[in-house]
Amino acid sequence: MTLSRGRTLAALLATAAFALSLSAQELNVVERTLPNGMKVLLVARHDQPTISCGWLARVGSANERPGITGLAHLFEHMMFKGTKTIGTKDAARDLELNRLQDEVQALIREEMAVLREKQRRGEIADMMDPAARTPRLVELLAKFDALVTEQRALIVKDEMDKIYQENGSTGLNASTSQDRTFYIVGIPSSKLELWAWLESDRLANPVFREFYSERNVILEERRQTLESRPGGTVNEAFNAMTWMAHPYHWQVIGWPSDIAQVTREQGSEFFATYYAPNNLTAILVGDLDPEKAYALMEKYFGRIPANPKGVPPVVTMEPVQPAEQRMVAEVEMTPSAEAAYKAVPAVHGDAAALQVLGVVLGGAPMTGRPGMGGPARPPSGRLHKALVLDQKAATRASAYFRGQKYGGLFTVSATPAPGKRPVEIEPLLYAELDKVVKDGISDDELARAKNALRVAHYTRLESNSGIRESLAQAESSGTYKDLLDSPKKVEAVTREDVQRVAKKYLVKESRSVLLTTRKGGGGEGMPRRRPGGPPPGVMPGAAPSSGGPVPAPAAAPVPEVKG
């Protein structure tokens, strides 16, 4: 592919001008660490009297194991249930009811073990079927429900949210992904001490109120957001096929059998391990004085003891994939062809070149909030031009790199045009990849891709909340310095780098392919997740991001589960 020198020069000049215009937006991040190991990131911006607050727990579904999948997301729910003094009318009775519920649940698990064995032997079809319950189990469930009813009469619902609202705060929320759990709120700058007290109280005095009944809430959430969505379980199965060994194998929301059986004791152990201050990062962006803000952090969060054992490492690594993996499914959703290639983590040295490659093939990245998606990218890139405009074989074609803490994927996908089938457009995708492998990219494509990534990077840093989210994403896969370094890493990418990573990672043996066709063989179907959108996962809001903070913003969001 050849392009005029004039177009190339124009693109380079535009890039340089844009970089100069944004030089004033470089972040001045003050990093401090409390004696208990909690990291604090402070960014002073005095354009409005507010502060975007958040604290990040470096824990997500990747830190789980079979038997407790979904626990990271369940804990996100638990952190909104109040503390020993917030959220209840009678703290002593509330704790006693928790103890009684634990005792009954232990007996319920014994009965469930009996049913599990019966199902294994074929004596019953489904241990979760109410018709399979033993009389003893029915009695225990009724006793447990009575305890839940009594506890709910003592609960002051959403008390923490009400306290925040009464003090002018907005946006109290949280989200869970594979690598992090993030708790956020926006406050008036005069209420920073209130925030420090409330959030440190959540960490210092948790009670895990309604733990068991909340499991049912999450099971229903799973049914609504995954199982009942067209193609939801197919995408879940495709993700599990793609990640064979690594904990990315399961969705953030977890397997239903694990959610239904996880215990408060397991939850308490999980909390003590992953919610200790030496595994947390607080992020404050806005109208603040760094020294005064740090003093408040020390006063309130400093009282929480560290976990001397630290966090166990995620040791399971994804093995080298020996051959192409394929899944063909008939589902009630728009047909598509998708190929996910094993790539690298967000902080890997090849991540920047893969980001550029994603923009060349798929178009400009989204500029919305990291981890939450954003405006759909405009149709552009080589795949759109070739498959949609020139060949008219597809109605949409996309590509993106998504790097996470422990691994990454480079994904290409397309929706066939009327009269076309996924199996017909699949080789058209590969043909465009092969062109990059064989011939590389042009200077103009490189310049435009870098400019697009730079625009996305700085656009995300225009607001306090955008800075907060970008810093959190960087901390979840590496450190905030990766965010600061991302523009120069992108700028250092050469045409040779892009061709090299295409040759290295876009190989048949490393890809997992999903072809979906409409049941009955029809070409049109119900809406599905857009190609190039959030990967198979729970809901946007986990699970994606950014492709990691290095380099610059990702072209695709990271699968997250919100609240």
PLM feature spans:
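Bacterial N-terminal signal peptides that target proteins for export
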Residues: 1-13
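Non-catalytic beta-strand/loop surface segments
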Residues: 23-63, 88-190, 212, 224-279, ...
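Active-site recognition of the HExxH zinc-binding catalytic motif
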Residues: 69-81
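A common structural junction motif
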Residues: 201-208, 300-308, 391, 430-441
